Amino acid sequence: MATTDRWFTTEELTQMSRPTMDRAIEAIDNGDPDTARRLCEEMKHEWRALHDLMVEGIAGLISYIAEVQGEEAVEQAWRYGNERTWKSDVEKIDSYPRKEIVKALAATWRAHSTSGVGPKPGAFTISEDDEKFTFSMNPCGSGQRLVRLGKYDGENGFGKTKEAHDWSYGREDFPLYCTHCAFMNEVQPIEWIGFPIYPSDPPEDYSRDPCVWYWYKDPADIPARHWERYGLRPT
């Protein structure tokens, strides 16, 4: 039944529709740090809710594909999507100064870790040696969190591989969601630009070990194993 009582004022509705960061900056400019802090905290959770919804949606969709069409369709699905989205990004990344990508990848993982909020929050460290930067996620903000949150458990859990594939890092019972990394990070970039864009190693034990990505200062130093696991050789 309709009501004549308003739930919010026009100003309140206007504020709800503004970017939270803009409101936080405005609060700082107005000398209101408490409101700015509150808005910054709210913004972390705004992104996490959307992030987790999309991650679980992707996990559910690829699980459905494997269940209904078979595991060979998993490869076809990832390839189809990446050709239409990720390929152009890989080519752009390869064109940028490699030092700049370290900062961009760190920003990506800050976002993907959803600012460390929510249950089993994402977290990562970065280290540097003479040849590369190592990003260690423990847990990563999506695939590993799904496992630690129990999203693969029970009758309605997400799917895992029934067989070992090169795109499941030679492992059976491997989380289907995480197989996208084989295609996005290694297999398809090798086909597009000649080398893996983000050579990576998934956790051995998802409950304990990190997921590790590498960014080499010179792509020529990327170890051959990141080709060989797919039956390929560096060129």
Regions found by a protein language model. Give the residues of each.
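N-terminal accessory segment detector
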Residues: 1-210, 217-235
